[in-house]
Amino acid sequence: MFLINVLTVTLPILLAVAFLTLVERKALGYMQLRKGPNVVGPYGLLQPIADAIKLFTKEPVYPQTSSKFLFTIAPILALTLALTVWAPLPMPYPLINLNLSLLFILAMSSLMVYSILWSGWASNSKYALMGALRAVAQTISYEVSMTTIILSMVLMNGSFTLTAFATTQEHLWLIFPMWPLMMMWFTSTLAETNRAPFDLTEGESELVSGFNVEYSAGPFALFFMAEYANIIMMNALTVILFMGTSCNPQMPEISTINFVVKTMILTICFLWVRASYPRFRYDQLMYLLWKNFLPLTLALCMWHISILISLACIPPQA
């Protein structure tokens, strides 16, 4: 029974990932005044299936001097972790109801660094290694601000449990009183998922596509799927934390539709940012976090602690 539950969560995610690639190509196409994919199937709707068949039927090429085991296991680890993070997300009911679901998500997203690092090191290419080191530095740096923001959210929520956020936000979404944190959180999720304008790991001109330069066919597709699964997951988490997914026990499907629509809107914002902004310079990326985001998030965290103490109020207890 548990296996069926797992499949009913993972298969729709993989399907959503496939069609998100099509949505991205279509959105970028229309923003650049062109059509995007429109040959395979009606309006190009079968393009993801054609891409999947092409990628998984090609022979993967292994560099002669690479570490075969790590080279193969890194993309598998990336996709496994990307799908595991979905387990505690309430949609409106989670696959596994953890008491410390926010900590679990942070731990899993930290582990994703290893798949990037292994892939860069195992390729035995200086470009791949430099791209991997950039990705690791960027991911670890932005996790600092994300953790501080989550701490502020937990102070308002009174619990690390994600299902408790729906109760907290029954009357008012947390995006309104905590909009500076929401802005910084959204920017941090862009950096955490290595998306434009923070896609420094894939610098085509200086790093020849970064840590996955040696990957092709199936293993490359696994990295690609992991990246897009992380994008949808981060947006789903943003909706849960800031945009209140209140669950009606009589009609849970209504809250699921509500949740999905909000997640789609945020995901399209991710694509819109990619179409609009140029890539950051590496020093600007680090300056933004360590000089701007970190002091501001720490100050807001202290502010939220002092509000609770000074007003002698406690958040809703789960």
UniProtKB/Swiss-Prot annotation:
The lineage of its organism: Eukaryota, Metazoa, Chordata, Craniata, Vertebrata. One of its GO terms (biological process) is aerobic respiration. Keywords: Electron transport, Extinct organism protein, Membrane, Mitochondrion, Mitochondrion inner membrane, NAD, Respiratory chain, Translocase, Transmembrane, Transmembrane helix, Transport, Ubiquinone. Disulfide bonds: none annotated. One of its GO terms (cellular component) is mitochondrial inner membrane. This is NADH-ubiquinone oxidoreductase chain 1. It comes from the Eukaryota. Its main location: mitochondrion. Core subunit of the mitochondrial membrane respiratory chain NADH dehydrogenase (Complex I) that is believed to belong to the minimal assembly required for catalysis. Complex I functions in the transfer of electrons from NADH to the respiratory chain. The immediate electron acceptor for the enzyme is believed to be ubiquinone. InterPro entries: NADH_UbQ_OxRdtase_su1/FPO, NADH_UbQ_OxRdtase_su1_CS. Its EC number is 7.1.1.2. It is an enzyme of class 7 (translocase). The chain crosses the membrane at residues 2-22, 69-89, 102-122, 146-166, 171-191, 222-242, 253-273, 294-314. Belongs to the complex I subunit 1 family. It is a multi-pass membrane protein. One of its GO terms (molecular function) is NADH dehydrogenase (ubiquinone) activity. It catalyses: a ubiquinone + NADH + 5 H(+)(in) = a ubiquinol + NAD(+) + 4 H(+)(out). It is found in: Mitochondrion inner membrane.
